[in-house]
Every structure is written in structure tokens, then in C-alpha cells.
A protein has these predicted regions:
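N-terminal targeting signals for export/organelle localization
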Residues: 1-49, 179
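A short beta-strand-turn-helix
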Residues: 42-68, 135
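Extracytoplasmic
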Residues: 45-47, 63-65, 97, 119, ...
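Short active-site neighborhood of thiol/selenol oxidoreductases, capturing the structured segment around
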Residues: 59-81, 87
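Structural microenvironment flanking redox-active thiols in thiol-disulfide oxidoreductases
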Residues: 81-119, 129-134
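Thiol/disulfide oxidoreductase modules built on the thioredoxin-like
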Residues: 116-121, 127-179
Length: 179
């Protein structure tokens, strides 16, 4: 009987394991740790063309020559909720920078409620297939992830995990001054 129960217990324990990853939802997406990566100008690679349908029903196309802060988010993500006010404040403090959200693994109803709750004024793409186009670069590897694309259209920085106002502002200034 003990061998039988042990035989049932082992597969149960293994099936419940996440392999040490931090699961943030049923799809077992990884939560970032807030580490920022800055790429020197000479080592940057071109970002893919950034365009697509937005949460408000419009279409977005990146403005050439503008620095872009691209934030990958979802309404169910608690670090996304924590960083939303800082992102909105920075978008107002830096009108010369284009802020853009990329909704991932979420419903449009929940996402619209999130945008309304946090009074997010910048657009959010609803087609997260754009994230696949960053393959081979500083790919968005967690939710949330924030990328900064320089005015030349190259990926300049990434924060994997929740951003803070001061950390993101410092990176924006570094990217702008390194143009």
C-alpha cells in the first residue's frame, strides 16, 4: 500500500512543480527582477517596426526619430499595477518620448479597466505578436518588461520586471544623451 501511495505522490508533486520559476498566472509566465540592461550605442541592434491596433480601437505607428518607451504589461500582473502610475507620470514629464504599452495574455475588457483605473493616456498595442520580432535582441522576457528604443530605432535598454520612476527616468536620460 505504501509503494502504491508513493507511486501516486511522486507524479503529483512533479506535476505541481514550476521548476523554480516564479509563476504569475496560469500560463506560468516569469516575473522579472527589475534588472536594467543598457546597451552602448555602438552595440545596439535595430528594433522591429512598431505598429498595430491599439486598445482604444485606433492604430499606432512609431514616429521616426523619437525615443520610445515600450512597456509589456497585463492587468493581472501585480508588478504591472505597481509600476503603472510611474509610467503614466513619466509619459507626462517626457512629452518628447513616445510611451507605448503592449498588452499580452489578457482580455480586452480587463485591459480597458486597467487603463481607466490607472488613467493611462498613452496607447497600448493589443497584438503582442510584435514581441516575437525582438528575437535575438534584448527580448521582452518577463511581465512586465520595459524596452527603450533610441531615436535611431535601435534597442537601447531593457528593464525586466517592475520599473521605478527614478530608474526609468535615468535610463531615458542616458538614451537621450547618448543619441
Amino acid at each position: 500500500m505504501k509503494k502504491f501511495l508513493l507511486g501516486l505522490l511522486i507524479p503529483l508533486v512533479v506535476s505541481c512543480s514550476t521548476g523554480g520559476a516564479i509563476s504569475t498566472n496560469e500560463q506560468s509566465f516569469i516575473a522579472g527582477n527589475g534588472v536594467a540592461t543598457f546597451i552602448p550605442k555602438a552595440e545596439r541592434k535595430a528594433a522591429p517596426a512598431i505598429s498595430g491596433p491599439t486598445l482604444d480601437g485606433g492604430n499606432f505607428e512609431a514616429t521616426p526619430g523619437k525615443v520610445i518607451v515600450l512597456n509589456v504589461w497585463a492587468s493581472w500582473c501585480s508588478p504591472c499595477r505597481a509600476e503603472a502610475p510611474a509610467l503614466q507620470e513619466l509619459s507626462v514629464a517626457h512629452p518628447e518620448v513616445q510611451f507605448l504599452g503592449v498588452l499580452t495574455r489578457d482580455s480586452l475588457v480587463a485591459a480597458r479597466a486597467f487603463v481607466e483605473r490607472f488613467e493611462i493616456k498613452y496607447p497600448s498595442l493589443v497584438d503582442d505578436s510584435i514581441l516575437l520580432k525582438f528575437h535575438g535582441q534584448l527580448t521582452p522576457n518577463a511581465i512586465p518588461t520595459t524596452l527603450i528604443i533610441d531615436g535611431s530605432g535601435n534597442v537601447a535598454a531593457r528593464i525586466s520586471g517592475e520599473v521605478t520612476y527614478s530608474a526609468l527616468e535615468d535610463l531615458i536620460e542616458r538614451v537621450k544623451s547618448n543619441e
